């Protein structure tokens, strides 16, 4: 009984150390960026979601619809939303943003990428863990929470772009 308890404790300690090592490893990386103008496809692991590839049903999330006009403050609203959600901005190029999120306990880093497609009037999102296999649904939940927050801003952005009508 005592031996089993010691073995179980050693296995648990080894597992916790392994998680801290994975967390440290995830800090050495960056988002994949745009590949031929689109967000990268998700790897064959469950810890990634992306709105670019609807045929990849396992990883697919719906892109965020944006109005045809009223996108003047869209980029700043996206950045502010990411920061409000606890993300750190990593890169910004034109209509592309990359950010990272870190877990509190083990410091796992996830990449969060956004591509604004003004021609199709959508925002594409990709959220993926840098290491490991399972994320317990964290990336999907993050992408969905981001989508809800940005979607709630759309009516006010569209209204702010409509010029006030003055006297004749």
For the regions a language model picked out, list residue spans one by one.
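Ser/Thr-rich, low-complexity intrinsically disordered terminal regions
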Residues: 3-7, 17-168
């Amino acid at each position: 009984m005592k031996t089993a308890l010691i073995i179980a404790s050693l296995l648990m300690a080894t597992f916790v150390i392994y998680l801290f090592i994975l967390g440290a490893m995830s800090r050495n990386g960056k988002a994949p960026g745009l590949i031929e103008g689109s967000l990268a496809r998700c790897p064959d692991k469950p810890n990634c979601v992306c709105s670019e590839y609807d045929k990849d049903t396992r990883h697919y999330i719906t892109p965020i619809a944006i109005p045809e006009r009223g996108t003047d403050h869209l980029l700043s609203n996206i950045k502010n939303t990411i920061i409000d959600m606890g993300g750190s901005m990593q890169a910004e190029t034109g209509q592309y943003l990359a950010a990272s999120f870190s877990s509190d306990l083990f410091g796992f880093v996830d990449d969060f990428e956004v591509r604004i497609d003004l021609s199709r009037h959508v925002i594409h999102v990709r959220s993926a863990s840098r290491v490991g296999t399972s994320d317990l649904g964290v990336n999907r939940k993050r992408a969905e929470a981001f989508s809800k927050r940005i979607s709630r801003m759309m009516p006010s952005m569209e209204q702010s772009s409509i010029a006030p009508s003055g006297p004749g």
